[in-house]
């Protein structure tokens, strides 16, 4: 799901065996409607364009894909934000378009010929019995890592994964940060520190 320069939205999906695809979500009460039906774009690609008023930041959505003999709900392959329902554990894509975009402070990356790398896992970085966040890592762990002389961090389990106990090795979406650790803006702030 991409926001265009004019404020409109476009979403594309490659589904060569689909006969129809719909965008379903909070904005249409999770129903298949013609206003949210994708159009074939050739070579198995499908596309839907929407005016800016049709989607809002934070709304949950999925695709409903129909194919010969059936159909079902799917997460878009290239979505960049997923959230998991605390009760059902079901994932939904989430429209991510905050009113206030993150403003980068550091525009250059320091390159070292021999980096000293600290491997870490955001969720396991707290002394408390809980899943830690990007903000907590930035505030509590990063200063200690720097004090120890490390100049590079390698973060494990950044991509969304359904089972936390897998330590992120069972990736379910390659393009979305794990929502357990915080928002994309909080991750940007960590990277910018």
Region locations from a protein language model:
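The feature marks proteins involved in alpha-glucan
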Residues: 1-10, 31, 37-119, 124-129, ...
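Short proline/glycine-enriched turn/loop motifs at strand-loop junctions of beta-rich domains
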Residues: 14-21
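Short beta-strand elements bearing conserved aromatic residues within extracellular beta-rich modules
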Residues: 21-23, 61
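Predominantly extracellular/luminal cell-surface or secreted proteins
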Residues: 24-26, 66
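Residues that line or immediately flank small-molecule/substrate-binding pockets and catalytic motifs
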Residues: 25, 124, 157
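Short amphipathic alpha-helices and their capping/turn segments at secondary-structure boundaries
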Residues: 105-108, 138-149
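Aromatic-lined carbohydrate-binding/catalytic grooves of carbohydrate-active enzymes
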Residues: 132, 144-189
């Amino acid at each position: 799901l991409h926001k265009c320069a004019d404020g409109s939205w476009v979403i594309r999906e490659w589904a060569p065996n689909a006969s129809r695809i719909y965008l379903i979500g909070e904005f249409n009460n999770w129903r298949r409607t013609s206003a949210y039906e994708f159009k074939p774009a050739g070579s198995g690609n499908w596309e839907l364009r929407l005016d800016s008023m049709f989607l809002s930041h934070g709304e949950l959505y999925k695709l409903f894909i129909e194919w010969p003999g059936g159909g079902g709900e799917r997460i878009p392959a290239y979505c960049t934000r997923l959230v998991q329902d605390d009760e059902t554990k079901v994932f939904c894509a989430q429209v991510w378009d905050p009113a206030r975009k993150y403003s980068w402070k550091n525009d250059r990356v320091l390159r070292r010929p021999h980096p000293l790398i600290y491997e870490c896992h955001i969720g396991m970085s707290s002394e408390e019995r809980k899943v830690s966040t990007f903000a907590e890592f930035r505030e509590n762990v990063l200063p200690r890592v720097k004090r120890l002389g490390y100049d590079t961090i390698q973060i494990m389990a950044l991509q969304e994964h359904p089972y936390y106990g897998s330590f992120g090795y069972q990736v379910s979406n390659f393009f979305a940060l794990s929502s357990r650790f915080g928002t994309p803006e909080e991750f940007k702030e960590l990277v910018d520190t």
